[in-house]
């Protein structure tokens, strides 16, 4: 499989996502799978709220390529199953959400929580355990404010935990042990109704290129 280290950085509305990072709660370096803006069409203007970068552990490449190598960027972008495989795959993921506009922790966590609950209810898997995980998720953000340029950092473990860190000095990592929550936070970004179509397109394009490069290298 081709190495991802030849990948370039991605700039999203003056936020630069480097090609590789070491997440705060992992010992390994992850590669930038893709990045994009999250915004809303408000009347005749597209208002950008956050820039989202999605990093994947090296283990993601052989896992995803086994099924998706040979597919075009467009085919991957349109495939709900492809993004489900990224969300549920047995490898670590790291997401950096950087503010373009200021947000309060309450504004951010309530919107993410709504999206997570909607995903679970659509799948018929919303239980008391998930409700408790959502309560803890909201409480982590309760007293936070995020000025432009500040970031929320999520680390998703395949074992079922979600690490949450804030970019400000002295921030510690809070870990929530709930597999469905860890997956739903990422799914809310890049799933069927994900808030960042641009990040989905970026992931599809960059991963498609890596799959092709891996195929060529192996011949």
UniProtKB/Swiss-Prot annotation:
The record marks 108 as: Important for catalytic activity. Pathway: Secondary metabolite biosynthesis; flavonoid biosynthesis. One of its GO terms (biological process) is flavonoid biosynthetic process. Keywords: Flavonoid biosynthesis, Isomerase. Its EC number is 5.5.1.6. It is an enzyme of class 5 (isomerase). Coiled coil: none annotated. Belongs to the chalcone isomerase family. This is Chalcone--flavanone isomerase. It comes from Clitoria ternatea (Butterfly pea). The gene is CHI.
């Amino acid at each position: 499989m081709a190495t991802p280290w030849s990948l370039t950085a991605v700039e999203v509305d003056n936020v630069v996502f480097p090609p590789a990072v070491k997440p705060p709660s992992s010992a390994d370096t992850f590669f930038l799978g893709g990045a994009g803006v999250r915004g809303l069409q408000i009347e005749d203007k597209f208002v950008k709220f956050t820039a989202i970068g999605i990093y994947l552990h090296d283990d993601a490449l052989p896992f995803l390529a086994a099924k998706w190598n040979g597919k075009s960027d467009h085919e991957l972008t349109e495939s709900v199953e492809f993004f489900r495989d990224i969300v549920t795959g047995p490898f670590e993921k790291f997401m950096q959400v950087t503010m373009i506009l200021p947000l309060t922790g309450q504004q951010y966590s309530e919107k993410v929580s709504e999206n997570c609950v909607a995903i679970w209810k659509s799948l018929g898997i919303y239980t008391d355990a998930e409700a408790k995980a959502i309560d803890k998720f909201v409480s982590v953000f309760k007293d936070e404010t995020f000025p432009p340029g500040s970031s929320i950092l999520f680390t998703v473990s395949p074992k079922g935990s979600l690490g949450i860190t804030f970019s400000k000095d002295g921030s510690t990592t809070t870990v929530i042990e709930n597999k469905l929550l860890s997956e739903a936070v990422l799914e809310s970004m890049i799933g069927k109704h994900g808030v960042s179509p641009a990040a989905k397109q970026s992931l599809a394009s960059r991963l498609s290129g890596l799959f092709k490069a891996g195929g060529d290298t192996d011949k």
